Structure formats: structure tokens, C-alpha cells
Regions:
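Short acidic-hydrophobic surface loop/beta-edge motif
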Residues: 6, 18, 116-122
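Short catalytic-loop micro-motif centered on adjacent basic/acidic residues
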Residues: 27-29, 54-57, 128-130
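Short Gly/Pro-enriched turn/cap motifs at secondary-structure boundaries
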Residues: 6-7, 108-110, 130-132
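Metallo-beta-lactamase
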Residues: 32-33, 50, 95, 124-211
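Active-site HxH/HxHxD metal-binding segment of metal-dependent hydrolases
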Residues: 33-120, 205-209
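Conserved beta-strand hairpin/beta-sheet module of binuclear metal-dependent hydrolase folds
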Residues: 1-48, 140-151
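Residue-level detector of beta-strand structural context in well-folded domains
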Residues: 16, 111, 116-117, 139, ...
Length: 211
């Protein structure tokens, strides 16, 4: 599985395009905010002759959903996420006003993912891990074959997700990381919602919130 990373919007959010040799792809957490950012995303997809088959949110905070409507309209995709994130998604028009940023309302979640579900595209299978704490129903996507993890805002290089937003809970987040993510192999590469990639092994050894 190949992963293309785009850092978008005023929150420096990481948007991911996951694809394989079949050219099918999924777009995870599209944060594209400006026309230039939208063009960066669509140009990459066109240049690589990719076919988007899923639009997925790990969670529905504003920085991760700013491009949902654009991607949904452009590629005819419905939204896939955990059912528990709909309440978060519903709050984002108000959140966008609080931050003073424009927001085209995302479509509602139509396809629901839960713990141990398998999301497929092309020849690739992703296992869904339920990882709440940063948000009430955040999910992570794990590819066992390629040892890659899309973690949203659950785990970062040297840090963890904030828990002071509505629906956040520190104990729940730590429990999610320890029971879901730290069970994975040390070599698993972690792609977070912000910042650089890391590995499970590095975070197990040196993350100050986990040691």
C-alpha cells in the first residue's frame, strides 16, 4: 500500500491518499481548505490515474472535514466513519464560526465502521481499530500486510491527541492507545493527523505520555 501525504489548512492537518497497484484509492480526512489545496489533491489523483472509492474520516473535527464536501461532490463518494462521530460532525458549522473560517457543510456519515470491521479497496484490506479519547468515536486504520497505521489524532510523534475538546477524555485516550495501538508490532509505521510519521516501537519506548 502506498500513502501520499498532504498537509492542508490553517491547522496543518495531514490528509492521506491510500492506493495500491490496482489504482483504486481512498481519501482519508480531507482537510483541503483553499482552491490551491483542492487542486493539489485532485492533480495528484489525476496524475497517478487513481480512482477514489472511499471517503473516510478517522474523526470529524473541523480540520479533518474541511474538504469533505469537495471530495464527495468531485468523486461522487458518500462519507464513511464511525456512527459515534456524527454528533461531532453536526457541531462543525458552529466550530467553524468560532475559528472564523469558512466551511462547506460535510455530508452526513452514510457508511459506518466499527471495531474489527474490514475496509477494502483494490487488493488492500484495512482493519478498523476503535480508538476514542481525542474524540468520542475516533477510528484508526491498520494494514497488517504493509505494517502501516492511519492513526488520526490519537497518537503523534512524541505526543498524543488533545483531550480538552468536547467528547475528549484523557483516560479513554490512553486506554485506546495501550489496548489497541501498542499491541501492534514495533515496526508498524504510524501516520498521524498532524506532524511527521513515527513507529509504534519509538512511541512505546520514548513517548512521555506512555512510558
Amino acid at each position: 500500500m502506498d500513502i501520499a501525504t498532504f498537509t492542508f489548512n490553517p491547522f496543518s492537518e495531514n490528509t492521506y491518499v491510500l492506493y495500491d497497484e490496482t489504482k483504486d484509492c481512498i481519501i482519508v480526512d480531507p482537510g483541503c481548505y483553499t482552491e490551491e489545496e483542492q487542486t493539489q489533491l485532485t492533480d495528484f489523483i489525476a496524475q497517478h490515474a487513481l480512482v477514489p472509492v472511499h471517503l473516510v474520516n478517522t474523526h470529524c473535527h473541523i480540520d479533518h472535514v474541511l474538504g469533505n464536501k469537495f471530495v464527495s461532490d468531485r468523486y461522487g463518494l458518500s462519507l464513511t466513519s464511525h456512527a459515534g462521530e456524527q454528533v461531532v460532525l453536526d457541531a462543525q458549522p458552529t466550530v467553524s464560526q468560532m475559528y472564523g473560517i469558512s466551511y462547506l457543510r460535510s455530508p452526513d456519515i452514510k457508511t459506518f465502521l466499527a471495531q474489527d470491521d474490514i475496509l477494502t479497496f483494490g487488493n488492500t484490506s484495512l482493519k478498523v481499530l476503535f480508538t476514542p479519547g481525542h474524540s468520542p468515536a475516533s477510528i484508526s486504520l491498520y494494514n497488517h500486510e504493509s505494517m502501516q497505521l492511519i492513526a488520526g489524532d490519537v497518537l503523534f510523534d512524541g505526543s498524543i491527541g488533545r483531550t480538552d475538546l468536547p467528547g475528549g477524555d484523557f483516560k479513554t485516550l490512553i486506554d485506546s492507545i495501550k489496548t489497541q495501538l501498542l499491541r501492534l508490532d514495533d515496526k508498524v509505521v504510524v501516520y498521524s493527523g498532524h506532524g511527521e510519521i513515527t513507529t509504534i516501537g519509538k512511541e512505546r519506548r520514548s513517548n512521555p505520555f506512555l512510558t
